[in-house]
Regions:
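N-terminal active-site beta-alpha-beta segment that forms phosphate/nucleotide-binding
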Residues: 50-99, 104-173
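Positively charged, low-complexity intrinsically disordered leader regions
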Residues: 1-49
């Protein structure tokens, strides 16, 4: 799958925001970056929620950490029946989406997308954790491509010899 983070700065590459692999989610610790490059390793979806609460990931980072946490939750319950997996994932979705009050609305939306993807994957007999991870990459691609488009429009609005004094994610414009 083509990725919109190709050739972007370290801080924007998906693996350096939050990444599910081998039964854990690694989240770049933005509380100390760029002074140090360290990752917080979460081995349960509750630990992902705690990392979000504790501001390990910041700015748009929770919007990658939350669905990667859902992939981890799917991995945690992989041996259960389909109904039990969905029940487990619904509880995980609540825990993750309510980890930070300022991001709850959007994280609920993302967790709901993950629940739909889990239902689809279970019906198709696919690996639910991998399906949610791939959906997260797809969602990131959509967001990154949208922000690139917004950024290109914004650049055209700068006056000749203008100065940009601060930088934020384009979605805040």
């Amino acid at each position: 799958m083509e990725r919109a983070d190709k050739d972007l700065a370290f801080l924007l590459r998906y693996e350096n925001v939050a990444w599910f692999e081998d039964g854990e989610v690694r989240i770049l610790d933005r509380r100390i970056y760029p002074a140090k490059v360290e990752f917080v390793t979460c081995r349960t979806h509750q630990e992902v929620a705690r990392a979000i609460t504790d501001m390990v990931t910041q700015s748009a980072g929770p919007y990658t950490a939350a669905p990667m946490g859902m992939a981890l939750a799917a991995w945690e319950c992989r041996g259960k029946s389909a109904d039990e997996q969905m029940e487990y994932l619904k509880k995980a979705a609540y825990t993750i989406s309510h980890a930070r009050p300022t991001t709850q609305k959007r994280m609920t939306l993302l967790c709901d997308i993950c629940l739909k993807e889990a239902e689809r994957a279970l019906s198709a007999g696919e690996n639910v954790a991998e399906a949610i991870k791939n959906k997260t990459i797809e969602l990131n691609n959509v967001r990154y491509n949208r922000m690139a488009k917004i950024g290109s429009y914004l650049v055209d609005m700068f006056p000749d010899n203008g100065t940009v004094m601060t930088h934020c994610f384009a979605e805040t414009i």
